Design a protein with these regions (language model features):
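Alpha-helical solenoid repeat scaffolds
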Residues: 1-208
Length: 208
């Protein structure tokens, strides 16, 4: 009850805090509110290996496969590849294959091509996978194959999920194109940024 009163006017900002508050609600008999907070907090909570095992066991009946997938997706977009690696075993098989490929790409580990080849067809155009492939190629100086990805993805906020992340890659690649005097191509990839807010928008509008 004391914890609930502390957060009467505003919810905790951290995922971990939401889980603790959710537990308090459940103990007080408010199962629905408690479950909602635990589900929300689980996605973004900063958990050690032992905390992950403990929380997973403790809140087993409140979490389903969708919650595990949401957490894996959050960790992948935040580039938390060691945390993501710990999550892989708890995901449904097809999602294990998707996030294994993403984890290997972002951690620059061995076996990337093999992992990508095992990704189910329905995920082959997953925005996160395409983003990680783009970043992997760009970091290796593979300009043409990076452009291949940018030319074939949908340039909408809904598809990109995190257009701010995509913009960082677009801007770096655009600068390489400008250096090579490929101005028209640079304009094309910067103008299709999909941003609608944030500091990246000003940068994108200026570059395009």
């Amino acid at each position: 009850k004391k914890i609930i009163n502390m957060f009467e006017k505003s919810e905790p900002l951290s995922g971990y805090g939401k889980i603790i508050l959710g537990e308090s609600f459940i103990k007080s008999g408010n199962i629905n509110e408690g479950t909602k907070l635990i589900k929300d907090g689980w996605v973004t909570a900063d958990l050690s290996r032992s905390e992950l095992k403990s929380f997973r066991k403790k809140y087993k009946k409140h979490l389903d496969s969708k919650d595990y997938i949401k957490r894996a997706d959050y960790l992948a977009w935040e580039n938390k590849y060691w945390d993501l690696k710990r999550m892989l075993r708890y995901l449904p098989k097809e999602y294990q294959l998707l996030y294994t490929a993403r984890q290997l790409l972002m951690s620059k580990s061995y076996g990337v091509d093999s992992a990508i080849s095992r990704v189910p067809k329905k995920f082959i155009n997953d925005p996160g996978l395409n983003y990680d492939r783009l970043k992997w190629r760009r970091k290796r100086g593979r300009l043409e194959s990076s452009l291949e990805i940018l030319d074939n993805v949908r340039n909408t906020k809904n598809y990109m999920v995190r257009p701010d992340k995509w913009w960082i890659e677009r801007s770096i690649i655009a600068r390489s194109l400008i250096y090579k005097k490929k101005y028209q191509k640079a304009y094309k990839i910067t103008s299709m940024h999909g941003l609608s807010e944030g500091p990246e928008l000003a940068d994108a509008e200026w570059m395009s």
